[in-house]
Amino acid sequence: MRRLLLLLAILIAAYVGYPYLTLYWLDQALLNDDQEALERLVDFPQVRADLKAEMQGQVLEKAAEIKEKRPILGTFGQALTKLVAPGLVDSSVDGMVTPEAILSNPTVVEHREKNESFVDFITYAFFTAPARFIFDLKDPEKPDSPTVTAIMTLDGFRWRVVGVEVPPLEQLLSKVP
């Protein structure tokens, strides 16, 4: 009976610790410029699809708000947004959410050159369901920077990043100089 309880305790500890180990592997992939490891740990097609849907929804929602404030100009703007926004969002996300783009990001390159871990960027990390784990990221050097939430799910026997939740457009755009 003791062995069974010990085995159960070890399995639970391994299960609870595994997503944190995955965060460590992500950190190491970024620091070592390891594209293959990053591709194993992040489901890039899924992340891009989710991010495109989220960003397109935010852009169209903003266009609808403008239409309510300025009916004539807003109607034209909303129609134009519906026509142009999907292509702009898709091409932007496709260009920015790739292993190559992430590994060549200036912040990532700077940390890699200094051999500094990205652990400081994580402000929260915990389970939201038995097979779902989230972690919040924020630039520690910029206290007013927006928080981005990454979502990991248990895919077979490994944890993978499958989504990213970004703050509302107003918050993102207010930080642009």
What are these regions (language model features)?
Residues 2-20:
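Hydrophobic membrane-insertion alpha-helices, especially the h-region
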